[in-house]
């Protein structure tokens, strides 16, 4: 909640952010803090450890949707007088754009599934190849980490904000 941020309650997303920004203000009182909201993500599979996976932000996790978290971060940061770059709303990362497809096996072999077609198709990291070949790269390489295209969108919004505040 906004109160978590203002009261710096550790253990919550907003509370932790409140603690972090307070510490930055302590150590750099003249500095300007820019908060960037999180972008949408797809199903993430770590290329170095394919057993490390997380589902995309198209589904709530722990009862929370990423869009609601991003909105709360932006609202709390703005109330605290911080500069906000709302990547979630403005960077163009969507469930459809984070990756072009996810290559998964179904009975008849492998198929390139576009969102939302892949959400209920299981990925078995012990026997299937990595599901994001180079041609699957969209706004991210792997459903989580921004690609050149994703970084360009983020950089553009950040540059605009920095021009406004400098």
Model-derived segments and their meaning:
Residues 1-152, 156-165:
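Alpha-helical cap/lid subdomain in secreted, periplasmic
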């Amino acid at each position: 909640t906004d109160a978590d941020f203002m009261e710096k309650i550790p253990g919550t997303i907003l509370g932790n952010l409140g603690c972090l920004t307070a510490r930055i203000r302590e150590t750099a009182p003249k500095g300007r803090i820019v908060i960037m909201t999180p972008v949408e993500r797809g199903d993430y599979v770590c290329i170095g450890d394919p057993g490390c996976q997380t589902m995309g932000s198209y589904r709530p996790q722990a009862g929370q949707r990423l869009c609601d978290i991003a909105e709360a971060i932006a609202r709390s940061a703005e109330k605290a007088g911080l500069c906000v770059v709302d990547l979630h709303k403005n960077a163009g990362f969507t469930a459809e754009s984070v990756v072009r497809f996810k290559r998964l096996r179904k009975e008849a072999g492998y198929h390139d599934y576009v969102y939302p077609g892949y959400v209920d198709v299981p990925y078995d990291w012990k026997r299937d190849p990595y599901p994001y070949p180079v041609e699957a790269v969209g706004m991210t390489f792997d459903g989580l980490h921004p690609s050149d295209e994703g970084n360009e969108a983020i950089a553009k919004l950040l540059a605009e904000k920095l021009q406004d505040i400098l």
